[in-house]
């Protein structure tokens, strides 16, 4: 009995001695660069193997005294090495396969699509970056980028009136202190006053990954005090891929209440002024307006609908990659809120507001990449993001009330042509360039608000109807030149210089009309209760309406920038220093200037923006970082225009001189 126990213990000890973990790295024998995605297989046990990570490393469990590793990667010669069990870490060099073949382009998969790849991008990044992979986005229930981004570290979102996430707040700083990129290129905003981009216009399913940068380097645009949000759109896969998704749901809020809607299809897109100009007597009548869009309905909404379609493939011996994707989202949202007014203001007490909102989003993008050869690549991206929202806001307090019927349409178009070129041995010299055309547009035609006193429409100032639209057009070019210098001892210098130029043009239009009610009492012929059928109210417009508003302007902005940056890498240390210079030329022209305001204005300024970053690799999965960067916050176009807003919930005035 004792001999059996001893035999079992000896067997367990023997197994424990034989089992172990071998760690290693696979590098290019000529350049010393780590090879990502190389295959490592145990020759004696072909079923046991792994692939190298983003830093070229691998871990492999073995249970032999001696074994042979077979290492291979496309474009390199297969390499076999015998390893003893007591050797815990090795470095394996792969030599380039110089056999002459017909030209073949090898396309690797995007590592950022997986969680492991996203974490690798974060570790290898020069600055502080958080990445959400396509896999994580697919698993989340969020249908817009605005809701996806709130799941990232150090990021919160600002919601709109219907409760939907809309703008990103980075590091606790207001939305104006960050900017938005698509595939590394800044895009314009459809907002009529500000620069920030609403992230709810982007369907999340069109993303390859989402990056949030919290510290700027010199090769990034300098107006991001809070950071930058970069949307990397789906790229062509390595093999044919076709996906379809369809989902539905229902907003539980409408189990207990009806959805308020209005006939937004009857809205006339152009105001009377846009249709016929200024009349001779400076007056308009109700014949110049339609009231069909003021008819409201109360019913149960249809279920939400989400649909998506994408197709990707590679052609011409993998030289040409194509990714086509489309998305459709139709959702019904609602919210109940309270607005508190300070004593002594226009309103007193609390205003209770109920929101009903139908949001329709359409997204389409096409991304093509062409590999001329192993050293030269062209990419052409075209994207169209569209959002339409029909919203009813029903507000009231103890005495007064107001109902607003608003339809808003926004879209962003972006077309970017990029080139990536490598020169010299091992691609030591690299040149990247981009040519960009973008447009953002927003329109809110016939935004109607009707004011009530109890069950009656106010006689004076019974309603306001306004037309607004604006567009933002960008033409931009980017150029980056990078050179890698490897020294004896393993240290590496990376030198970068580059610049960008952007020409932005913005136009904004605003036209508002005030109406009185022809009668202040409820007429029995009007249907419904509490003046719900607003299209039957007898309104009378006051004179012509207001077009002398600061929101009627044309503006231009020209930005030129250049930078220089150097990165030094030695063992676990990485130092990055750079400086960026940006010159800004802004100007505006008021279309209908009022008295005591400047009809034109211009300003020019230059900013010098240094940055310095240090990274120390404590562990393969952990880094210590220090970052310093100087950045700016440019005023929006509306902020340099002398303006005064008196028809919102509060009064606002700016730049009187």
Predicted regions: what they are:
Residues 46-57, 83:
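Short, acidic Ser/Thr/Gly-rich low-complexity loop/linker segments typical of extracellular
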């Amino acid at each position: 009995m004792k001999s059996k126990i001893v035999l079992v213990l000896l067997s367990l000890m023997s197994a424990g001695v034989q089992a172990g973990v071998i760690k290693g790295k696979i590098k290019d024998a000529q350049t010393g660069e780590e090879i990502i995605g190389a295959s490592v297989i145990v020759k004696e046990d072909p079923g046991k193997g792994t692939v190298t990570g983003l830093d070229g490393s691998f871990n492999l469990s073995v249970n032999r005294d001696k074994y042979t590793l077979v290492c291979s990667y496309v474009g390199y010669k297969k390499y076999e090495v015998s390893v003893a069990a007591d050797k815990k870490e090795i470095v394996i060099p792969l030599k380039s396969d110089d056999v002459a073949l017909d030209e073949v382009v090898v396309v690797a998969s995007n590592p950022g699509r997986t969680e492991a790849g996203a974490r690798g991008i974060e570790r290898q990044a020069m600055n502080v970056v958080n990445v959400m992979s396509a896999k994580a986005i697919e698993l989340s229930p969020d249908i817009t980028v605005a809701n996806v981004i709130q799941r990232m570290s150090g990021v919160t979102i600002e919601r709109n009136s219907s409760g939907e996430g809309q703008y990103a707040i980075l590091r606790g700083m207001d939305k104006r202190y960050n900017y938005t990129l698509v595939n590394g290129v800044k895009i314009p905003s459809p907002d009529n006053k500000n620069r920030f981009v609403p992230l709810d216009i982007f369907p999340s399913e069109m993303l390859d990954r989402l990056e949030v940068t919290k510290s700027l380097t010199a090769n990034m645009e300098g107006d991001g005090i809070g950071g930058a949000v970069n949307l990397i759109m789906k790229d062509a896969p390595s093999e044919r891929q076709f996906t379809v998704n369809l989902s539905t749901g229902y907003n539980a809020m409408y189990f207990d209440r009806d959805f308020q809607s209005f006939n937004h299809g009857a809205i006339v897109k152009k105001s009377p002024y846009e249709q016929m100009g200024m009349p001779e007597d400076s007056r308009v009548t109700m014949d110049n307006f339609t009231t069909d869009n003021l008819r409201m309905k109360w019913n149960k909404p249809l279920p939400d609908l989400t649909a998506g379609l994408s197709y990707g493939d590679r052609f011409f011996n993998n030289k040409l990659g194509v990714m086509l994707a489309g998305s459709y989202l139709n959702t019904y949202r609602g919210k109940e809120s309270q607005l508190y007014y300070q004593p002594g203001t226009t309103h007193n007490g609390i205003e209770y507001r109920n929101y009903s909102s139908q949001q329709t989003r359409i997204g389409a993008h096409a991304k093509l990449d062409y590999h001329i050869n192993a050293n030269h690549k062209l990419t052409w991206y075209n994207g169209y993001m569209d959002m339409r929202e029909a919203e009813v806001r029903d507000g009231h307090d103890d005495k007064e009330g107001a109902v607003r019927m608003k339809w808003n349409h926004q879209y962003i178009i972006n077309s970017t042509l990029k080139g990536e070129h490598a020169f010299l041995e091992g691609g030591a010299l690299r040149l990247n360039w981009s040519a960009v055309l973008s447009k953002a547009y927003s329109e809110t035609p016939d935004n109607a608000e009707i004011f009530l006193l109890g069950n009656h429409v106010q006689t004076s100032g019974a309603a306001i109807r306004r037309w607004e639209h604006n567009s933002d057009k960008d033409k931009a070019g980017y150029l980056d030149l990078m050179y890698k210098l490897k020294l004896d001892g393993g240290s590496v210098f990376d030198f970068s210089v580059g610049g960008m130029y952007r020409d932005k043009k913005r136009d904004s239009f605003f036209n508002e009309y005030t109406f009185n009610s022809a009668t202040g009492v409820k007429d029995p012929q009007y249907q419904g209760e509490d003046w719900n059928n607003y299209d039957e109210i007898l309104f009378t417009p006051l004179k012509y309406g207001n077009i002398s508003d600061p929101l009627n302007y044309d503006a231009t902005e020209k930005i030129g920038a250049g930078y220089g940056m150097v990165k030094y890498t030695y063992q676990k240390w990485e130092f990055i220093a750079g400086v960026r210079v940006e010159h800004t030329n802004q100007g505006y022209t008021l279309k209908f200037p009022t008295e005591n305001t400047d009809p034109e204005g211009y300003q020019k300024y230059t900013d010098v923006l240094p940055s310095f970053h240090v990274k120390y690799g404590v562990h393969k999965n952990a880094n210590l970082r220090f970052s310093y960067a100087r950045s700016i916050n440019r005023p929006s176009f509306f902020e340099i225009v002398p303006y005064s807003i008196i028809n919102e919930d509060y009064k606002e005035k700016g730049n009187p001189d």
